[in-house]
């Protein structure tokens, strides 16, 4: 089989189907791309964690229907280098050969097509459920909240993003760290993997989101290609799915009258200095607030940060891991933040960092 297709839509199609961040050795199928060619269509299938994707392109095929499985990232990278108006994909016993003008490039197959077939997303039967995708909201989650996602499997539910109505929570129970924003877009409360966030961020503006039972389908239609991707969230009713979202959301409402307004850039500078001069691998800093302002201190650094507002006069001291505290302040979209004490049973147990876009709760370390 030889299949000829326009290069520009092929580049767009591979960019949609193959998301670099979603290719991982931990999900072996993600390293594969399945190419199927008929006399009229080229179909590109990929899989990643809880995601099935498919793109169909029109073109001209010569020969019998052919299927092959090759390296996904290698295929995407090679296609991106092609500059001719058209490219021909020749299916061989060993994989494929891309022919561009007088040049050709051989890509070996990774598996025989009769050994494995990648899953395809379901077709859309109900157009009435279509909604626009606000990519900026998903981009906000990726850029400002995903940093807090747990990486340890000790509490696997916190490796996901919780979203319900407009609320979005991302956090790590082990580090007593949680973030909250109101950029959610899905109707049902559910848990999303970082792979799903990457998918939604990568979509073009014309993409639509469809509800398919407990799953969702993202679709894009153009004159040159049709794209669909189906993803399955995790739900709190499932095993390991309890995020304790109600409890966490309750923590996100501190007494803001007791907050101190400070320049986050000054906090980051002080933390960088503390990390630079740290004399121990197990390094903590003392975070002290009083009616004069904020002080960040350890055995070698003593940095004072003046407040941007009239301080409430409340005083408290907490210990933090400087790297985690730095990640919290860095994640805030705005440089000026309000920091409030987190009070539980009349005891200060952490801080709540607030700007106009999000709220972050970070628990202090035990002495």
What spans do the regions from the language model cover?
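Structural preference for solvent-exposed beta-strand-turn elements
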Residues: 1-367
